[in-house]
Amino acid sequence: MAKKPWKKKYGYGIRPCQRCGHVGPGLIRKYGLNLCRQCFREIAHKLGFKKLD
């Protein structure tokens, strides 16, 4: 009888990026974005974020 795969309930691998599906560290969850940092950099300006100098 084969073992059932263990499903993570918490930690890095639980939530994927909403845009590309990347799983792991680098996920931005603030304000309910749920985007990886690469996707956030690509669309941050469209979302209304401004880069400060």
UniProtKB/Swiss-Prot annotation:
Disulfide bonds, paired cysteine numbers: none
Role this protein plays: Binds 16S rRNA, required for the assembly of 30S particles.
Organism listed in the record: Methanocaldococcus jannaschii (strain ATCC 43067 / DSM 2661 / JAL-1 / JCM 10045 / NBRC 100440) (Methanococcus jannaschii)
Keyword Iron-sulfur: no
HAMAP family named in the record: Ribosomal_uS14_2_A (MF_01364_A)
Keywords: Metal-binding, Ribonucleoprotein, Ribosomal protein, RNA-binding, rRNA-binding, Zinc
Gene that this sequence comes from: rps14
Keyword RNA-binding carried by entry: yes
Entries under InterPro entries matching the protein: Ribosomal_uS14, Ribosomal_uS14_arc, Ribosomal_uS14_CS, RIbosomal_uS14_euk_arc, Ribosomal_uS14_sf
GO CC terms: cytosolic small ribosomal subunit
Family of the protein in this entry: Belongs to the universal ribosomal protein uS14 family. Zinc-binding uS14 subfamily.
Protein name per UniProt: Small ribosomal subunit protein uS14
Domain of life, source organism: Archaea
GO molecular function, one term: zinc ion binding
Pfam families: Ribosomal_S14
One GO term (biological process): cytoplasmic translation
Complex and partners: Part of the 30S ribosomal subunit.
Binding-site residues for Zn(2+), renumbered to this chain: 17, 20, 36, 39
UniProt cofactor note: Binds 1 zinc ion per subunit.
Taxonomic placement: Archaea, Methanobacteriati, Methanobacteriota, Methanomada group, Methanococci
Cofactor requirement: Zn(2+)
